[in-house]
Regions:
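Short, solvent-exposed beta-strand edge segments and adjacent coil->beta transition regions
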Residues: 39, 103-107, 135-139
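Non-transmembrane alpha-helical segments in soluble domains
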Residues: 56-59, 82, 120, 156
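PLP-dependent enzyme catalytic core of the Aspartate aminotransferase-like
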Residues: 114-167
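Short, flexible turn/loop "capping" segments at secondary-structure junctions
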Residues: 35, 51, 100-102, 132-136
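Active-site C-terminal subdomain of aminotransferase-like
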Residues: 1-69, 73, 79
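Short alpha-helical functional segments enriched in proximate histidine and acidic residues
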Residues: 61, 84, 162
Length: 167
């Protein structure tokens, strides 16, 4: 991503490469850099082939599964996660992510009453991958490509166990 206020400023220091050179003069080898304007002027060179092989494999997975299928599963997984969290009661957990699936992705941000980063650390120790945001938000994102409904269930069970053991 290159912000538009920087995209056309050719005086800014940057890494430059083959792909940021003007296509019309690129092969003339004049010894001077003829930078493209806009975000294209920030491109580097060809990516390493081994890195691209891994990216190709991951893109193949997305194509095999299908984006529409991922979206459907994502909505169901996140809806299930939301349902399970609401069973804990809003006096314990507040979901601050919009409830409308059209206004969110797979991530739910939650606030847990009287919790701090210790709760996040305990979830991490229990094998849950989540994200902590000050002052009191834990973000969890059941990802449809590799998370299951059982994963979501186990996450909430671990959360309940940690909350029950907390003073």
């Amino acid at each position: 991503f290159v912000h538009e206020r920087h995209a056309h400023n050719k005086d800014l220091n940057r890494f430059t490469g083959w792909w940021s050179h003007n296509k019309k003069t690129r092969f003339k080898m004049r010894g001077e850099f003829d930078q493209l304007s806009g975000a294209e002027g920030w491109q580097l060179s060809n990516p390493p082939i081994l890195s691209m092989a891994a990216i190709k494999a991951s893109l193949d997975m997305f194509q095999d599964v299908g984006i529409e299928n991922l979206i459907k599963k994502s909505r169901k997984l996140t809806g299930y996660f939301e349902f399970l969290l609401k069973q804990l009661g809003e006096d314990t957990i507040k979901i601050i992510t919009p409830s409308n699936p059209d206004e969110r992705g797979c991530q739910l941000s939650i606030q847990v009453k009287n919790a701090n980063k210790t709760l996040h650390d305990k979830l991490t120790a229990a094998g849950v991958i989540s994200d902590w945001r000050e002052p009191d938000v834990i973000r969890c994102a059941p990802t449809p490509l590799y998370n299951s409904f059982e994963d979501v269930y186990r996450l909430v069970e671990k959360l309940k166990k940690i909350l029950k053991a907390s003073p």
